[in-house]
């Protein structure tokens, strides 16, 4: 059967240039997500670290003061966000190298491990701070802890706002891990 041809699916491989374009796009998105996470962690650490409020009590000589450093959980929050921000800043050059050399495998694997470690650091910091913020707003009747946000309202508003940047950075780190996994799987 000289003239017969086989009918069915044919496989066409994508041109090599489009694969590089996708890898470069993933690397650019990686860099953008790192910048967003840096902004979130830096803003959270600075805002929490500068949070305090003083209330006068009967006279101007007796005052009640609320600071982030009064609660070790909020101090851990500031330290964790600062460490993650420093790491993300130091990882920017490596992310830029991935844009230039999209085939870099071991450096991307290193970023996956370190990104996972930073996610493991920022998650308990943000979660513990969220628990303290909840207690500050609602209190706990069974433990006889009163809600302090009725008196220290600007303090509570500020520490509540700090959580947004930290939880946003958590989401960015998860997306960075997914992007790195996609980039490594394409090799």
UniProtKB/Swiss-Prot annotation:
Residue ranges of the TM segments: 28-48, 76-96, 116-136, 163-183
Pfam families in the cross-refs: CASP_dom
Main location: membrane
Domain of life: Eukaryota
Membrane association type: Multi-pass membrane protein
Protein location: Cell membrane
Topological domain ranges for the Extracellular compartment: 49-75, 137-162
GO cellular component, one term: plasma membrane
Keyword Cell membrane listed: yes
Extent of Basic and acidic residues compositional bias: 1-10
Renumbered residue ranges of the record's region Disordered: 1-20
Keyword entries, A-Z: Cell membrane, Cell wall biogenesis/degradation, Glycoprotein, Membrane, Transmembrane, Transmembrane helix
Glycosylation sites: 52
Coiled coil: none
Function description: Regulates membrane-cell wall junctions and localized cell wall deposition. Required for establishment of the Casparian strip membrane domain (CSD) and the subsequent formation of Casparian strips, a cell wall modification of the root endodermis that determines an apoplastic barrier between the intraorganismal apoplasm and the extraorganismal apoplasm and prevents lateral diffusion.
Quaternary structure (record): Homodimer and heterodimers.
Similarity remark: Belongs to the Casparian strip membrane proteins (CASP) family.
Protein's UniProt name: Casparian strip membrane protein 1
């Amino acid at each position: 059967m000289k003239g017969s041809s086989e009918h069915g699916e044919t496989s066409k491989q994508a041109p090599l240039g489009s694969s590089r374009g996708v890898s470069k796009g993933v690397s650019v998105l990686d860099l953008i997500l790192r910048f967003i996470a840096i902004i979130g962690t830096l803003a959270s650490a600075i805002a929490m670290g500068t949070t305090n409020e003083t209330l006068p009590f009967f006279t101007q000589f007796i005052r009640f003061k609320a600071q982030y450093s009064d609660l070790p959980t909020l101090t851990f929050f500031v330290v964790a966000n600062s460490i993650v921000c420093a790491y993300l800043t130091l990882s920017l050059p490596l992310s830029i190298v991935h844009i230039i050399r999209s085939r870099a495998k071991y450096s991307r694997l290193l970023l996956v491990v370190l990104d996972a470690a930073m996610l493991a650091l920022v998650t308990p910091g943000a979660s513990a701070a969220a628990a303290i913020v909840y207690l500050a707003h609602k209190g706990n009747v069974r433990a006889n802890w009163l809600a302090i946000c009725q008196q220290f309202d600007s303090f509570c508003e500020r520490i509540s706002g700090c959580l947004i940047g930290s939880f946003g950075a958590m989401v960015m780190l998860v997306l960075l891990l997914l992007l790195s996994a996609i980039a490594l799987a394409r090799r």
